[in-house]
């Protein structure tokens, strides 16, 4: 009768494994990693004594990793999610400067309480009203075309104005 070797559970931390003989079990239906040796299949067990962390520990870690963001709804219909540590910084979107102060933020709640796609008729606009900051228009103006030469190239004299003796000296 063939035999199979496996590690004794109480010696899993030892660098020298003790093997015991057990009856052969077909491993075609199990998903264990096996290797064939001359004495038969050998089950490869993990040498690590540690257990995977419990689900409660994983949930506790996940709760602390949440990224806190706030949401700004703009007049153009765009929504911008702003990191909470970036408060009191402004930004420009589609040629309009926006202030990111605390009044202009709303927390994104999600689900049925989500402010997404809701009509907010009242409230302050998030457009910056400071007159010192230039507010360029949506369309960029193009420079006027001129018929003269560009400024970087000086005017060249007409070839007709050059004396014929000049040409005679060049083509001798």
UniProtKB/Swiss-Prot annotation:
Biased composition (Polar residues): 137-152
GO MF terms held by the record: DNA binding; structural molecule activity; zinc ion binding
Keyword NADP: no
Predominant location category: host cell
Location(s), subcellular: Host nucleus; Host cytoplasm
Entry-linked InterPro entries: Gemini_AL2 (IPR000942)
Disordered: region residues: 119-172
Segments for region (Transactivation): 158-172
Keywords: Activator, DNA-binding, Host cytoplasm, Host nucleus, Host-virus interaction, Inhibition of host innate immune response by virus, Metal-binding, Phosphoprotein, Suppressor of RNA silencing, Viral immunoevasion, Zinc, Zinc-finger
Zinc fingers classed as unnamed: ranges: 76-93
One family name in Pfam for this protein: Gemini_AL2
This protein's record includes keyword Phosphoprotein: yes
Record-level GO BP terms: symbiont-mediated suppression of host innate immune response
PTM text: Phosphorylated.
Gene Ontology CC, one term: host cell cytoplasm
Taxonomy, superkingdom: Viruses
Subunit-level organization: Monomer. Homodimer. Homooligomer. Self-interaction correlates with nuclear localization and efficient activation of transcription. Monomers suppress local silencing by interacting with and inactivating host adenosine kinase 2 (ADK2) in the cytoplasm. Interacts with and inhibits host SNF1 kinase. Binds to ssDNA.
Note on domains (UniProt): The zinc finger and the transactivation region are involved in PTGS suppression.
UniProt similarity note: Belongs to the geminiviridae transcriptional activator protein family.
Name of the protein in its database record: Transcriptional activator protein
């Amino acid at each position: 009768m063939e035999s199979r070797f496996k590690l004794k559970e109480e010696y899993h931390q030892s660098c020298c494994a003790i093997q015991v003989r057990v009856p052969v079990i077909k491993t075609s239906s199990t998903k264990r990693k096996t290797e064939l040796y001359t004495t038969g299949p050998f089950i490869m067990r993990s040498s690590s004594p540690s257990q995977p962390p419990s689900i409660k520990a994983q949930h506790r870690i996940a709760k602390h990793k949440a990224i806190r963001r706030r949401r700004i709804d703009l007049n153009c219909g765009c929504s911008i999610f702003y990191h909470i540590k970036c408060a009191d910084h402004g930004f420009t979107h589609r040629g309009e400067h926006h202030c990111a102060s605390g009044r202009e933020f709303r927390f994104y709640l999600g689900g049925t309480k989500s402010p997404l796609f809701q009509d907010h008729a009242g409230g302050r606009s998030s457009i910056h009203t400071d007159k010192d900051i230039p507010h360029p228009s949506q369309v960029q103006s193009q420079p006027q075309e001129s018929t003269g030469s560009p400024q970087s190239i000086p005017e060249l004299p007409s070839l007709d104005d050059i004396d014929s003796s000049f040409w005679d000296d060049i083509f001798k």
